[in-house]
């Protein structure tokens, strides 16, 4: 038996299984040991069944796959070779686990006899991602001692676990040499594939799993609770689950606090600012019940309110993981939000508290005055809706800017907003944005901090592959301006936290052959955007701002609103 031929047969069954579980994208890094998997992915692409994406940097590739999976809402597979290539996927795997995004990571490996004996590029890869995968499959070296149906069943079981608890599946695949020179004729004719030939021809899963989605039942005491004073908080959710939330809350007369990641147009915007007012916060704490939809709230003051609330607490979230860092005694509904809303009809009532509405309206004009008419970080966040296309998507990085947007912006209803707020790292943000833009095939605006952009600068190469107008804003405040919020001595903060880099991005962008602009005014920006939206390519727009301008405005807003007196 030719080892190279059977390596391909083994890989064929692996990839055919994944395609039947919904995988339509394979993200591939260069490497020799992963050759059998890579060649099978190419075969699937040649038959127009999948799309292959490539990148030379495994860390960026993992985050690119994460972006694809976020926007497609289907599992995306990643193929890498052995050694530290596999280790470089770890940050993306952590983020996928924390946010319930489905990745299937295929790590090629050396065979067992080459592990822990000094062989080149050989590390211990089984369970290398610890508990972050929802399922780990450590395959043996390809061998006819294992039937093809065993291999299919083993992989399908892992995918079924992923369907029940979204996250990462890790499949470690050792291959012995030789890895090359296997003819397609020999692969197709191999006797090991004969028992599954019907399955190969039908393009259906081996095991027909029946979904166990249960009908959402009305809470036994809903007729009581819907007459009470309530607050809903809406966090990170798929757009399709958010339809009807605000109409439901408004009918109930309940207060609604919405995170920018929810894609819900806030009826009480700027909550991160007006919740700094202790008088209004204390009145809000008089609510009888809080219902949390989704998770991952950005606002510090929303999180402080939730931590202080001690009455009835419900959580509605499709996933099964814990999503309450305040550890309330609560009622949990494992359900899609729109299904839960249908099962819990609202009762029409007048608003039970008017001060939040009055303070929110006051904030709208107050913020406008404070951010001013200049093009700066705060005004860009406040007027973010001005720069978005009608049919596009938005990605927000993990800098000070995402907090400013959550606090100061009011985005259109249902506008798709994506973030990496699971572990909230600054790694892989450009790569994630590229995956979202290419996966959505819509105009993309990505807002990234300067340090985040420098950290992931390799991923600018991915933006050469876009086919829609793509705009990357780099907010360059010369270092980690978010650390200006810390109570640390100024000289220590500057040297050990902010770490000014004194770099600009014009030359870096030229290296990657992307368009570049640096507007100084809103009029400049308008002209730049008009051109950028007319091109099916990437434009990087650098906004240079003072190191502490935005944090100063932000802190001033919080301080002044905290003393505001608003009557009913």
UniProtKB/Swiss-Prot annotation:
GO terms assigned for molecular function: 2-succinyl-5-enolpyruvyl-6-hydroxy-3-cyclohexene-1-carboxylic-acid synthase activity; magnesium ion binding; manganese ion binding; thiamine pyrophosphate binding
Manner of cofactor binding, per the entry note: Binds 1 thiamine pyrophosphate per subunit.
UniProt-listed Enzyme Commission number(s): 2.2.1.9
CDD domains named among the record's database cross-references: TPP_PYR_MenD, TPP_SHCHC_synthase
GO biological process, one term: menaquinone biosynthetic process
NCBIfam families per record: menD
Function recorded in the entry: Catalyzes the thiamine diphosphate-dependent decarboxylation of 2-oxoglutarate and the subsequent addition of the resulting succinic semialdehyde-thiamine pyrophosphate anion to isochorismate to yield 2-succinyl-5-enolpyruvyl-6-hydroxy-3-cyclohexene-1-carboxylate (SEPHCHC).
Protein name in the entry: 2-succinyl-5-enolpyruvyl-6-hydroxy-3-cyclohexene-1-carboxylate synthase
Organism (species): Pasteurella multocida (strain Pm70)
This protein's encoding gene: menD
């Amino acid at each position: 038996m030719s080892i190279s031929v059977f390596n391909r047969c083994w890989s064929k069954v692996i990839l055919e299984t994944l395609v039947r579980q919904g995988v339509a994208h394979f993200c591939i890094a260069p490497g020799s040991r992963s050759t059998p998997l890579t060649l099978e992915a190419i075969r699937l692409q040649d038959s127009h069944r999948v799309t292959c994406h490539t990148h030379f940097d495994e860390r960026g590739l993992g985050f690119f796959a994460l972006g694809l999976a976020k926007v497609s809402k289907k599992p995306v597979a990643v193929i890498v070779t052995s050694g530290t290539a596999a280790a470089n996927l770890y940050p993306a795997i952590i983020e996928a686990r924390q946010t319930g995004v489905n990745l299937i990571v295929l790590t090629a490996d050396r065979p067992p006899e080459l592990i822990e004996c000094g062989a080149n590029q050989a590390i211990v890869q089984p369970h290398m991602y610890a508990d972050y995968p929802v399922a780990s499959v450590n395959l043996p070296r390809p061998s006819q001692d294992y039937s093809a149906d065993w291999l299919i069943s083993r992989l399908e079981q892992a995918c079924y676990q992923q369907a029940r608890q979204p996250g990462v599946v890790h499949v470690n695949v050792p291959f012995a040499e030789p890895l090359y020179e296997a003819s397609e004729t020999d692969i197709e004719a191999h006797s090991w594939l004969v028992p599954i030939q019907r399955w190969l021809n039908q393009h259906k899963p081996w095991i027909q799993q029946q979904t166990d989605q249960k009908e959402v039942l009305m809470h036994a005491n809903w007729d009581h609770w819907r007459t009470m004073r309530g607050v809903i908080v809406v966090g990170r959710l798929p757009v399709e689950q958010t339809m009807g939330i605000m109409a439901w809350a408004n009918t109930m007369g309940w207060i609604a606090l919405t995170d920018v990641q929810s894609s819900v147009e806030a009826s009480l915007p700027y909550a991160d600012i007006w919740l700094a007012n202790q008088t209004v916060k204390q009145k809000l704490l008089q609510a009888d019940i809080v219902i949390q939809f989704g998770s991952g709230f950005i606002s510090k003051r929303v999180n402080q309110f939730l931590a202080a609330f001690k009455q009835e607490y419900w959580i509605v979230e499709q996933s099964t993981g814990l999503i309450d860092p305040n550890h309330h005694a609560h009622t949990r509904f494992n359900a899609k939000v729109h299904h839960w809303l249908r099962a819990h009809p609202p009762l029409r009532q007048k608003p039970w508290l008017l001060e939040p509405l009055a303070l929110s309206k006051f904030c709208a004009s107050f913020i406008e005055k404070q951010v001013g008419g200049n093009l700066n970080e705060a005004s860009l966040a406040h007027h973010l809706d001005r720069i978005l296309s009608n049919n596009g998507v938005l990605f927000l990085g993990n800098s000070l800017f995402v907090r400013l947007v959550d606090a100061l912006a009011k985005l259109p209803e249902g506008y798709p907003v994506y973030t990496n707020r699971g572990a909230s790292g600054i790694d892989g943000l450009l790569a994630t944005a590229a995956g979202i833009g290419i996966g959505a095939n819509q105009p993309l605006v990505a807002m990234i901090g300067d340090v985040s952009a420098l950290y992931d600068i390799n991923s600018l190469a991915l933006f050469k592959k876009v086919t829609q107008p793509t705009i990357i804003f780099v907010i360059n405040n010369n270092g980690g301006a978010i650390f200006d919020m810390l109570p640390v001595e100024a000289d220590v903060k500057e040297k050990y936290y902010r770490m000014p880099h004194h770099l600009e991005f014009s030359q870096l962008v030229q290296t990657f052959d992307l368009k570049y602009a640096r507007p100084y005014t809103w009029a400049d920006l308008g002209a730049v955007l008009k051109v950028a939206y007319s091109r099916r390519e990437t434009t990087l727009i650098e906004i240079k701002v003072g190191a502490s301008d935005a944090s100063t405005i932000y802190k001033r807003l919080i301080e002044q609103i905290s003393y505001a007196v608003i009557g009913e």
